[in-house]
Amino acid sequence: MPPFAKPETVLKRSEELINVGQHQAALAALNEIFTSRRFKQTPLQSLEPIMLRFVDLCVDLKKGRMAKEGLMQYKNVSQNTNAQSIELVIKHFIKLADAKVVEAQSKADAAVGEIDVDDLEESETPESMLLGSVSADQNKDRTDRVLVTPWLKFLWEAYRTALDILRNNARLEVPYQQIANQALKFCLQYQRKTEFRRLCEVLRQHLQNVARYSHHAHAINLTDQDTLQRHLDTRFAQLNSAVELELWQEAFRSVEDIHNLLTMAKKAPRPAMMANYYEKLARIFMVSDNNLFHAAAWNRYYALARSIAKSEQEHTQIASYVLISALAVPVISSNAPGTGNLHKSKSDFLQADHEARSRTGRLTSLLGLSRTPTRAGLLKEALNRDILKKARPELRELYNILEVEFHPLSICAKIEPILASISQDAEMAKYVKPLHSVVLTRLFQQLSQVYDAVKLSKVMQLVSAFKAPHSYTPAEIEKFCLNACKKGHLNIRIDHVAQAITFQDDVFSTDVHPAASASSEADNVGLQASPSELVRTQLSRLATCLDTTLKTIDPTILADAQAAKRHVFARAVAAAEDEHKAAIARKALLARRKELLEEMATRKEREEAAARAERARAAAEAEQKRIAEEQKKREQDRLNKEVEAVRIEEAKKMAKSLQERGGLKLSEEELANLDTDKLVQMQVEQIEKEKKELAERLRLIHRRMDHLERAYRREEAPLLSADYERQKQEDLQYHKAARITLLQTSKDKHAADLEIKKRLTRILPDYQQLRSIIEDKRRGEFEERRRKATEQIELEKERRRQQVRDERRRERQEAEEAERRRVQEEQEARARAEEEERLAEQRRVEEAQRAELEAKKRAEIEERRAKFQATADKQRQREEEAEANRRSRAAGTGAAPAQELAAADATWRRASGSPAPTQAESQRPPIFGAARTGGAGGWRERLAAKEAAGGNATAAPSAPAAAPAPASSGAYRPGMFRAAAGAGAGGRTDRVAATPLPPAAAAAESDGFTEVKKNVYRPPGRRA
């Protein structure tokens, strides 16, 4: 990895590369900053200009992925310390990309306009006209694909990158919403429908991830009113853009998003916002041909629009839309609950409800309704709000014809002019088709109450009032009747032979769904009761008649009934009072529980927020401390350098000053070697010397001045009296002249003042009148101000009292909380102390056991060492005795025969190769110097000593055989002791001299070590 370069150096290098046209190399140089290990420790003040230049190069070179990686790295560095920096960089990034799109669009427009025209008088030739009719705007589309589309794609990727970087961070929430709104405007401006769908998915995914990242330090809190309001504003902008782009599915999904956010809001949204919500929802329902919920949306919109300041014309228009949308709801599809179908089996209703319940429930919840709306309910609510008075006159007439009057033979002719008038309005023309369905339904309902059968030609004559394009054919009328029968609203039979329509009415028929008949009766205008209705209500009518007769014959029955009714009412009131008290108690209990739960949740949230803030504060303090330490260190280094420079400069100045005075003569080398203290000392000495010289000179001057001053005073004494007399005469003359001048000036001023008083006396009444007016006015203003000030003081006093009460209550709560935390901390500290004491006791026991084991091991080692030392001492004593015997025999004995030498050699070999000790124990290392000092060194030393004595190994008489070497005791012997024992036992030196060893063996023997056989340790039970 290359060494880390300073950000200023990298930026300067990139600027140089850009100036010579190497933009790619400049981008690579800037990108190396993000891969460095010290990137996170770099100050943001140095990184921000680098990021701006990096973004410029990425936009120029269309490096969207590289820009995303760099911005992500910069976000990780700056989000905890300076969120405004990343906001500035991302806005700069979006601004540059948008500028590139605008520039490309202008180039494309210019390219399309630059069409070569050979003949200015005939710019449009027949060939060009034919080609233009075939190719349309292919030239412009091709130019846009080449110039504009790549930059549009880059701008779209820039918006996605910005949203991905700014998401799910409370500090970056405001720029996130701004970028989201800009992205929506981008899709709307350039009609990017596909990108709009993807943008909606991205925003929806980010909102779903809010709960996943809720444990982060800077997570988004949707319970905060400002945050939720920003999300709502963005979703409303998304809804408006979807409606403008006519993406109705996305608009509906946006409505669901808004509804989900509204359910989370603790405070009701603004009426204007909700009015916009219902207006867009009404447009969506109109496009989806859902007339029932379209009318319900208009109804909800009107309820909010009344509270918004609008003109009378706007109120009339909105009321007209509410009324016509409710009238346009088809009667067939809105009568029965859910679907409104009549005369269906139970399974049919269950299947239909199962299919439509979820959809209807969703739509109902989106409108904020408690139950599914119906046509009758919407019309009733419209009447309760006096919409008929505010709606247009033709719509009021339409309502009367459809819902109030009964005229089956003229209903079509009366409604046709109204529908023609409505068709002229472009906004209301879309209600004409559903209104025709309502008119036909009302026509057949009213005909069924008057006729048992009617000719199809008669029906065609009645509907012939409708003009094209809303005219009907017999096939369409038949299809409508079959549809009404299929949905259970009408009971009609068509006779194709007689070309007639028969209205069937079964006297004993009943509705399968209990709510169907009630709904049908509410929507239908009845002239008379049908036979089935008469049969169905016969018992109720008979009971009513008998009850009326009894009350007429015996009035006491009515009195008893009223008394019983009053008694029942009294009992009901008492029971209701008890139930009311129980309900209040239960409500208070639930409220208290809810309050406790909210308090616990608030406390938990506050503690979590405090913990997050504490962690963030600790991290920020650590970072600030590190930065402060680095700054302090740099400042200290700078101060040290400055102090050193100042010290050197002062030393130079001081030395120069001393040289200029002439009392100090120093060379350049001496000046360089002297420090400030020495120079100060020299300067002090120089100053003391100058002071002494100055004092001596002053003493001489004073002595001379004393004599001179005495002579001066002796001469001036006679002249002082004459000068005093002259001064008195001059002072007297000056005093007289000044007094005369003062008197004259006072007289002139007095005369002028009298003249001024004479002139001002004429305006004195006006002055006094004006003064009284001004004083009265000022006095009134003063009293008003004093009254207001008094009121303000009282308000401030009351506010201060309330503030003091709040502060005392808060202090009391804080004291209680502090006491609770103190008790908890004491308990935790006590538990920690007990745990630490238990662990310390356990450690002491373990250490005592470990010390006891170590003492036992140490005693065993010392015991073994003492045994080994005693054995070694005995062995050394025996070796010393053997060496003494050998020396005593060395003078009179000769060399042994070859056989004895071989036998002795074999004996020595056997002694050397004795088995190794069974226990491997630590022994003292051999001391070769001690062995040589005792006379039992190597064979070369012994051979040299023998030759020096003049002995001959071959001519020496044979000595008696030495005693065999003692068997090995199994203990380890150092090399010194083994050599001594071998010499004493068999005369190893003599045998070596008599039988020379090979060079390899001699080299092996010269190292001073003895070969020891290595045996494998076996336990006592397994030894052979």
Swiss-Prot record:
Residues 797-973, 1001-1024 are annotated as: Disordered. Disulfide bonds: none annotated. The keyword RNA-binding applies. One of its GO terms (molecular function) is translation initiation factor activity. InterPro entries: EIF3A (IPR027512), eIF3a_PCI_TPR-like (IPR054711), PCI_dom (IPR000717). Its main location: cytoplasm. GO terms for biological process: formation of cytoplasmic translation initiation complex; translation reinitiation. It is found in: Cytoplasm. Keywords: Coiled coil, Cytoplasm, Initiation factor, Protein biosynthesis, RNA-binding. One of its GO terms (cellular component) is eukaryotic translation initiation factor 3 complex, eIF3m. It holds the Pfam family eIF3a_PCI_TPR-like. Residues 890-906, 946-971 have a biased composition (Low complexity). Residues 331-508 form the PCI domain. Residues 575-717, 777-889 form a coiled coil. Residues 797-866, 873-886 have a biased composition (Basic and acidic residues). RNA-binding component of the eukaryotic translation initiation factor 3 (eIF-3) complex, which is involved in protein synthesis of a specialized repertoire of mRNAs and, together with other initiation factors, stimulates binding of mRNA and methionyl-tRNAi to the 40S ribosome. The eIF-3 complex specifically targets and initiates translation of a subset of mRNAs involved in cell proliferation. Component of the eukaryotic translation initiation factor 3 (eIF-3) complex. PANTHER family: EUKARYOTIC TRANSLATION INITIATION FACTOR 3 SUBUNIT A, EUKARYOTIC TRANSLATION INITIATION FACTOR 3, THETA SUBUNIT. Belongs to the eIF-3 subunit A family. This is Eukaryotic translation initiation factor 3 subunit A. It comes from Mycosarcoma maydis. The lineage of its organism: Eukaryota, Fungi, Dikarya, Basidiomycota, Ustilaginomycotina.
